[in-house]
């Protein structure tokens, strides 16, 4: 009889179909011999590699148990900072977007304001700013760039002046989980603003997507050192496991895999976009490893057919 699989592919997880770098796999295997030791040295090596990659001092980097922990700690740190200063605080997010920042803010009893995307699915920066200006307190913006689920970028020439137009009473948490997949030259990492000295900009990234290490939980935050110091007060002290650390270092060093991950995603994206065009289905410009597209007919039926 023909073997069948009951495994369901969770497309909304945006996992990397390539799997991890072979060098990362070997690094994990090699780490078994030292699994009885704490990974302090390996954790330090990840920070050193990231600092070199982004051309910053190591004090700009904070590792997380996946970037979800970095997002949680950043949101919590900024909320507590505002509350300690006896200031009202709230989170402002585009809608739809990745919802972890929203969940963390709500868990702390902080109001969340959702600003609908513009008709073209881009961030409505005017309405986002209006939401902050209508509030007498501290505003934390969570901006996923490229955005999830639209996979669209916000160009630097638009985003950066907009951020700089705010007072220091507004903070910008830029989630760049999919930045390594971006092809559009209009994109520029928010780390540029951090390097310029802005203390109200925090950038998070992950090894889960581009480097296919989702199961090993390695992420990081990049911000000004004094901001990193404040955020790390809300982080676990032992948040990076040995296997994840050695895999992260090996992945950063494997330039061949990085090129393959980027190119294979670009090719796959184009194949899907061509198919959508042939089917007459509209889609948003994609810069991630997923595509936001039109569905004709009943959504529930579509979901059931995708599971079949």
Where are these regions (language model features)?
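Conserved PLP-binding catalytic core of the aspartate aminotransferase-like
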Residues: 266, 278-307
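PLP-dependent aminotransferase class I/II
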Residues: 200-284
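N-terminal "arm"/small-domain region of PLP-dependent enzymes with the aminotransferase-like
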Residues: 1-37, 52, 137
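Glycine/small-residue-rich loop that forms an oxyanion/phosphate-binding "nest" at active or ligand-binding sites
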Residues: 66-81, 155, 175-183, 187, ...
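Active-site phosphate-binding strand-loop segment of PLP-dependent enzymes
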Residues: 119-184
């Amino acid at each position: 009889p023909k073997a069948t699989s009951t495994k369901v592919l969770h497309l909304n997880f945006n996992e990397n179909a390539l799997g991890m770098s072979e060098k990362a796999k070997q690094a994990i295997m090699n780490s078994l011999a030292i699994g009885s030791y704490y990974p302090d040295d390996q954790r330090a090596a990840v920070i050193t590699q990231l600092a070199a990659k982004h051309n910053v001092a190591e004090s700009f980097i904070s590792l997380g148990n996946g970037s979800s922990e970095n997002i949680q700690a950043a949101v919590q740190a900024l909320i507590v900072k505002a509350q300690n200063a006896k200031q009202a605080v709230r989170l402002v997010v585009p809608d739809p977007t990745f919802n972890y920042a929203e969940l963390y803010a709500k868990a702390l009893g902080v109001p969340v304001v959702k600003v609908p995307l513009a008709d073209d699915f881009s961030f409505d920066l005017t309405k986002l700013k209006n939401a902050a200006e209508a509030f007498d307190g501290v505003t934390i913006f969570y901006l996923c760039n490229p955005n999830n689920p639209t996979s669209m970028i916000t160009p630097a020439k638009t985003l950066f002046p907009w951020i700089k137009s705010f007072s220091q009473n507004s903070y910008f948490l830029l989630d760049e989980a999919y930045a390594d997949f971006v092809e559009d030259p209009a994109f520029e990492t928010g780390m540029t603003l951090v390097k310029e000295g802005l203390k109200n900009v925090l950038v998070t990234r992950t090894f889960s997507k581009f480097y296919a290490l989702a199961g090993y939980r390695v992420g990081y935050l990049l911000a000004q050192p004094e901001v990193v110091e404040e955020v790390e007060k809300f982080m676990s002290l032992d948040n990076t496991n040995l296997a994840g650390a050695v895999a992260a270092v090996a992945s950063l060093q494997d330039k061949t895999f990085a090129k393959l991950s980027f190119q294979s995603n670009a090719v796959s994206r184009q194949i899907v976009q061509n198919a959508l065009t042939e089917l007459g289905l509209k889609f948003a410009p994609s810069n991630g490893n997923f595509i936001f597209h039109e569905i004709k007919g009943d959504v529930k039926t579509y979901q059931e057919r995708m599971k079949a």
